[in-house]
């Protein structure tokens, strides 16, 4: 992936005063948020094209195993808010809203973006880098999400002196998400 090194450089800059295990959850949480938002957006556009008015019907998404993403948690909203000093709280609120709409995610998503030691300017810059689509059918076919997760888990593991997550485990995790 051509964007891997750029993302890693940003993640490394983001680190600052926080532990690698903490910024790992920041990065992987953003990747997940981008993925479900992209998947939602693709389904949303399909529903709009059908013209039946079901684009805000949660059941229409859940039927296709797509997480419903409320407007305040959609990537376009997050990206437009990236330069605000409150971006950390905006992301935490987005994670809470997603959990509220998707009961099987309750208590799973990270909600630690508003903490003071996380540089909000760098967080906004990281959000700006996420311009690639992770949740489209084409991305799923190319296993972009799996490759991104595998790359980051490998980098986080090697930077912390921990074990490397085998590709089979990454495939399992991504399969569970999808």
Where are these regions (language model features)?
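Non-catalytic, mostly N-terminal accessory regions of nucleic-acid modification and defense proteins
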Residues: 1-177
